[in-house]
Amino acid sequence: MSINMNANFLKLLTHFRRHDLTNFKSEHDTLYEKALETGDHLEVTSHYYSVMSTVIDEYFGGNFHFVPPKFEGQKLEEALKSLHCHIAEKLELSENVHCLDIGCGIGGVMLDIADFGAKLTGVTIAPNEAEIGNEKFANMGISDRCKIVAADCQKMPFEDSTFDVAYAIYSLKYIPNLDKVMKEIQRVLKPGGKFIVYDLIKTNDYDKDNKEHYKTLHHLEYACGMPSLHTQSEVEAAAEKWEMPVVERENLEETYGNRAFHYCFSASPMFMWLVSSPVIDHTIRMAEILRILPAGFKQFNRTFLCGTVNSIVGGGRMGILSGADILLFEKKKI
């Protein structure tokens, strides 16, 4: 599937004609406030993906994470597959290797690396994502080596030392307590097993007292139902505590000629206009009034669709958000 951001933005408008969004934001607000009080974001994350997982499958090719292109004009789906294969190569995937995908969503990464021949097991907190992914695997005839389990990655239903390697792509940002998830990853990995993290992280340039910095990242965290974003040093320290020291770091923006991780959005002036223009906002409001779009769509779009894109691009441009760092860890051998 070709991922055309401009065309897909317009398709999304049609897609949401099928949804009742009147209560979505109020439910999200309630669950997000509850998450801030309890420190448990599982409910609000699941609520977010109850709608967004289908969007990600249909309009983003099954992956909602980003990567700098290797060259100007490279299609997003090609850049993502290149990233996924790059990670698979770093983990030395092959037959007789059992690999864990932590926060796998609907299995988009697993599909891209299935040809490496490894046994792939994914974990997602959202049951509807497991259903979508497993149905796709069955239709493709790869269910014998690709499977998604609906479970909490902080309490996984696997025996100790089950997996040879593991990766987490844009998923640890949903975990408030990295200590718990790193302990669990260390438990299910075999001694000497490698583990890759590729995620959105807060950079050292973030200033909590800077109103624009705070507004940008807080909106992203709120819209996606996430806790406060982690820094690279926090990720590394949490893994180190559980005897999984970092053994390699790679920033793909530097590797690929300083192109931004948000290139898929920001490289298109037309797309950025679509997600920022008051004209589009007004048009959507009129479509709501005429019942062409469902009630609540204007606010949903401003908060969860366009708002998220603008936060990602804005955070990247301010240098307070990074989304192109590969961190390779290795569990110490006994």
From Swiss-Prot:
Its EC number is 2.1.1.-. It holds the Pfam family Methyltransf_11. InterPro entries: Erg6_SMT_methyltransf (IPR050447), MeTfrase_dom (IPR020803), Methyltransf_11 (IPR013216), MeTrfase_SMT (IPR030384), SAM-dependent_MTases_sf (IPR029063). PROSITE patterns: SAM_MT_ERG6_SMT. CDD domains: AdoMet_MTases. One of its GO terms (biological process) is regulation of dauer larval development. Keywords: Cholesterol metabolism, Lipid metabolism, Methyltransferase, S-adenosyl-L-methionine, Steroid metabolism, Sterol metabolism, Transferase. Pathway: Steroid hormone biosynthesis; dafachronic acid biosynthesis. GO terms for cellular component: endoplasmic reticulum. It catalyses: 5alpha-cholest-7-en-3-one + S-adenosyl-L-methionine = 4alpha-methyl-5alpha-cholest-7-en-3-one + S-adenosyl-L-homocysteine + H(+). Expressed in the pharynx and hypodermal syncytium. It comes from the Eukaryota. Disruption phenotype: Mutants show impaired dauer larvae production. GO terms for molecular function: S-adenosylmethionine-dependent methyltransferase activity; sterol 24-C-methyltransferase activity. May irreversibly shunt sterols away from hormone dafachronic acid production. Dafachronic acids act as ligands and bind directly to the nuclear hormone receptor (NHR) daf-12 suppressing dauer formation and inducing reproductive growth. By reducing the biosynthesis of dafachronic acids, this methyltransferase can regulate dauer larva formation. Belongs to the class I-like SAM-binding methyltransferase superfamily. Erg6/SMT family. This is Sterol 4-C-methyltransferase strm-1. It comes from Caenorhabditis elegans.
